[in-house]
């Protein structure tokens, strides 16, 4: 649904056109190879993959292709990960249409797009040095662990997550154990409740 809305928003602009879209990372990589776009818009939430993994994959094969992340997820947690992976901008879906269009044009022109809040945070971290410990325990999770945590919070079971991520159940169980350790959660029930609460909090932003 969001892809359709974004397509309509872009296609209404006389100087912009959508040459394709994709629901999965594999579809995206194939489409990029076939259409050779000037810009790729990435959502952090992908079926069976991390958006940051896709960004890294695109960067490895198309080094000069600019990427903009448009996501519902809190920029304070995801934006720096996306930028480190190779994205040139991050804008939240809740932003006005004019902000999204401005971000697209800035990244197309070779500039970075960051919100004032995010830019200020990054400058502060650079000037004063990154803290020894992440501000929130959730920030200690790796990209893949964060994907698993989000899927758990969406009510998906271990087997479903394994199928969507195309890994074994044992791998997902390993992720679950590492997440519990990093978040100081003792039981699987605590993990599920914590994940659900976090996903609901993200949705209400």
Sequence positions of predicted segments:
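The feature encodes the CheY-like receiver
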Residues: 2, 47
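Short hydrophobic/Thr-rich beta-strand motif most characteristic of the beta2 strand and flanking loop
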Residues: 15-23, 31, 185
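Acidic catalytic/metal-coordinating carboxylates
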Residues: 24-27, 50-53
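Active-site residues of response regulator receiver
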Residues: 43, 71
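Short amphipathic alpha-helix used as the core "switch/output" element in two-component signaling
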Residues: 52-64
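Short, flexible helix-to-coil linker/hinge segments that flank and couple to helix-turn-helix
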Residues: 77-84, 89-143, 147, 189, ...
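Helix-turn-helix DNA-binding segment
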Residues: 134-171
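Basic, Lys/Arg-enriched C-terminal extension of HTH/homeodomain DNA-binding domains
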Residues: 177-205
